[in-house]
Amino acid sequence: MAASFSVTRRFFDDKNYPRGFSRHGDYTIKESQVLEQYGQAFKALDLGEREPATKEEKDFVAFCRGERAAETFFEKTWNKYRTRINTKKRVYTLSSDVSEAASGGEDYSGE
């Protein structure tokens, strides 16, 4: 697999993971390393900016197009990444009204 997914630089997603993949907690150590090391190739193949050169890359492109399910560790990791960045994150609070809680609490009378 040395020739497959060759890249010249590491992959960082500062928009979704400003502190890095390993510090965010969504990925295992191995998944973080794979995303950083091969993420540029994954992204280019997924967006069609790069032509697949090997059988592994051709299979990866077929997975990205939805022609087959994720089977390899690389495909499962990229699928997890795409799912995480495209899913809206929910934030839960203990307050009934977030704007009221942020304004300092108008229920307090101070008497």
UniProtKB/Swiss-Prot annotation:
Identify the Pfam families for this entry.
DUF413 (PF04219)
> What does this chain do?
Involved in the organization of the Ori region of the chromosome into a macrodomain (MD). It constrains DNA mobility in the Ori macrodomain and limits long-distance DNA interactions with other chromosomal regions.
Instruction: Determine the domain of life of the protein's source.
Output: Bacteria
Q: Which InterPro entries match?
A: DUF413
Q: Which family does it belong to?
A: Belongs to the MaoP family.
According to its UniProt entry, this protein's organism is: Haemophilus influenzae (strain ATCC 51907 / DSM 11121 / KW20 / Rd)
What protein does this entry describe? Macrodomain Ori protein
Result of knocking out the encoding gene: Disruption of the gene causes a slight decrease in transformation efficiency.
The taxonomy runs: Bacteria, Pseudomonadati, Pseudomonadota, Gammaproteobacteria, Pasteurellales
